[in-house]
């Protein structure tokens, strides 16, 4: 990857923590510092403007890792600039950062801050060609970004997005629920504070949609049950919103069905890239599966 792109890891800031144990302590309300990976395709003409994609990773707690390597190669081949934020709660940065998690909350603003950082620091990025895409937890962050900042994104893709935290708490294990009700996180269960879980759920914010959006889900998803995403789709339709979606039937790969390296996964990703390209107009769009295959091993 490094041969075909400039890669950097930068440090930036988001809002102060939501939960502050000692509000009067020195620096207690300082902005949260977090990292983000920056990927700039080599050989692009820096005298011209280029589109930006924001790519938040999944979770609950995770980080941006090599699972996204082929997706990055495919985005690089299209000459997208990419920023991948390691928003609060990401792993690999110690217990304190882990416990800053704010699922469906301030992590959304960290991601938005990474978008703004790119526009402020790289003058070859076109502010009118900015998109966002993510899967699972990253899909939830994608949805909240376009709901809260609709004028700042021209297009979005949400793959198997976590959509309804209340429903999700009903079918997940107690250990999973404990991640949310922990004192350092939400501090209450969905039963104890329904409104707080609604606030963090895209399905209850569907009325805010203004940005062109594509949603994909899979009926055999073992992580984000398809009924969560169906609830989101129904909510968007009830609000008479314009968007695109596809519910895939039992595609191998389950939750990761369009992120693995199978032929079907590549076909689905090609649809995603075509959706993004309609609004971002990259220099070298992927128009076929052949283009996508070549992105894995040939410079474009």
Listing of model-derived features with the role each one plays in the protein:
Residues 2-128, 133-135, 170, 256:
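Cap/lid segment of the alpha/beta-hydrolase catalytic domain
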Residues 16, 22, 87-300:
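Active-site-proximal cap/loop segments of hydrolase catalytic domains
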């Amino acid at each position: 990857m490094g041969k075909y792109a400039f890669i950097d890891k930068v440090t930036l800031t988001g809002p102060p923590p939501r939960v502050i144990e000692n509000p009067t302590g020195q620096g207690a309300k300082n902005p949260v510092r977090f990292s983000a990976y920056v990927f700039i395709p080599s050989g692009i003409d820096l005298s011209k403007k280029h589109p930006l994609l924001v790519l938040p990773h999944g979770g609950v707690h995770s980080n941006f890792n090599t699972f996204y390597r082929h997706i990055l190669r495919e985005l690089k081949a299209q000459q997208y600039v990419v920023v991948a934020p390691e928003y609060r709660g990401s792993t690999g940065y110690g217990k304190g950062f882990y416990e800053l998690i704010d699922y469906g909350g301030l992590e959304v603003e960290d991601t938005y801050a990474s978008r703004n950082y790119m526009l402020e620091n790289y003058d070859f990025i076109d502010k009118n060609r900015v998109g966002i895409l993510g899967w699972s937890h990253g899909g939830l962050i994608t949805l909240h970004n376009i709901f809260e900042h609709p004028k700042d994104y021209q297009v979005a893709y949400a793959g198997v997005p976590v959509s309804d935290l209340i429903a999700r708490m009903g079918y997940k294990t107690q250990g999973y629920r404990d991640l949310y009700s922990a004192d350092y996180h939400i501090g209450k269960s969905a039963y104890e504070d329904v409104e707080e879980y609604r606030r963090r759920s895209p399905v209850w914010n569907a009325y805010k949609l203004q940005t062109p959006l594509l949603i994909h889900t899979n009926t055999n998803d073992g992580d984000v049950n398809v009924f969560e995403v169906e609830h989101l789709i129904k909510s968007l339709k009830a609000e008479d919103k314009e968007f695109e979606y596809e519910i895939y039937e039992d595609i191998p790969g389950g939750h990761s069905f369009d992120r693995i390296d199978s032929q079907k996964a590549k076909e689905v990703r090609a649809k995603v890239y075509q959706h993004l390209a309609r609004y971002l107009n990259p220099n070298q769009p992927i128009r076929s599966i052949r283009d996508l295959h070549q992105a894995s091993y040939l410079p474009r």
